[in-house]
């Protein structure tokens, strides 16, 4: 799904927080490591999800493919990578258009008096070089999500099917949908 830009499983909802303050948002998966059950996406270090993950590293991810009629729910433990070998490797693979997100002066969610991209006018239309985009690296993070368990649900008119996979305890079971 990660290498297939058209896959619905490439853009899950990521949900993090605690009992009284949780939030969800769409993320774009960038890499997976099936051997270690890790998936990762990029974020801005100034995003409020980083603050939430620093308080509680446990999160959930929700995937849904309407055509396949499949829903997958993951329970994950997150690691925030910032200015380390993991972010360096990912930053080098991040394209010109994607780097633009990390060039804003103020972090995501900062209030503004007017509608804005947050970019300086000279950057708003991709009028910057890859070299100039290096300034954004200081804001770039890679969030790695270690999958602890997941549930699979297939929706069918003749009857749904549901299964749970506990990766920590190596247990699988069918569930009533």
List the model feature ranges, each with a label.
Residues 11, 37, 56-59, 139-142, ...:
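Short, surface-exposed beta-edge/turn micro-motifs
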Residues 17, 44, 64, 146-148:
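Structured loops at beta-to-helix junctions and adjacent beta-edge loops in soluble globular domains
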Residues 5, 10, 64-65, 103:
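A short, aromatic/hydrophobic, helix- or strand-capping loop or linear motif
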Residues 9-11, 24, 36, 69, ...:
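Sequence-level motif detector for i,i+2 pairs with an aromatic at +2
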Residues 30-69:
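A short mixed-secondary-structure module that forms the rim of ligand-binding clefts
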Residues 1-36, 40, 51-52:
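An N-terminal domain-cap segment
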Residues 16-20, 63-67, 154-156, 167:
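Short acidic, glycine-rich loop/turn motifs
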Residues 71-177:
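Charged, gly/pro-rich active-site loop segments
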């Amino acid at each position: 799904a990660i290498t297939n830009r058209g896959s619905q499983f490439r853009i899950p909802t990521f949900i993090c927080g605690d009992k009284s303050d949780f939030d969800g948002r769409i993320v774009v998966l960038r890499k997976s490591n099936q051997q270690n059950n890790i998936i990762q996406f990029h974020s801005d270090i100034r995003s409020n999800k980083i603050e939430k993950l620093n308080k509680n590293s446990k999160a959930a991810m929700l995937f849904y493919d309407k055509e396949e009629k499949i829903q997958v729910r993951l329970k994950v433990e997150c690691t925030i990578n910032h200015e380390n070998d993991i972010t360096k490797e990912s930053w080098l693979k991040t394209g010109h258009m994607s780097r633009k997100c990390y060039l804003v002066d103020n972090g995501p969610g900062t209030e503004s008096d007017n509608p804005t991209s947050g970019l300086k006018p000279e950057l708003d239309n991709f009028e910057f070089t890859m070299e100039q985009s290096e300034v954004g690296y200081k804001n770039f993070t890679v969030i790695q999500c270690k999958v602890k368990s997941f549930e699979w649900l297939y929706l069918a008119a003749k009857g749904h099917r549901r299964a749970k996979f506990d990766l920590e305890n190596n247990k699988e079971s069918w569930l009533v949908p």
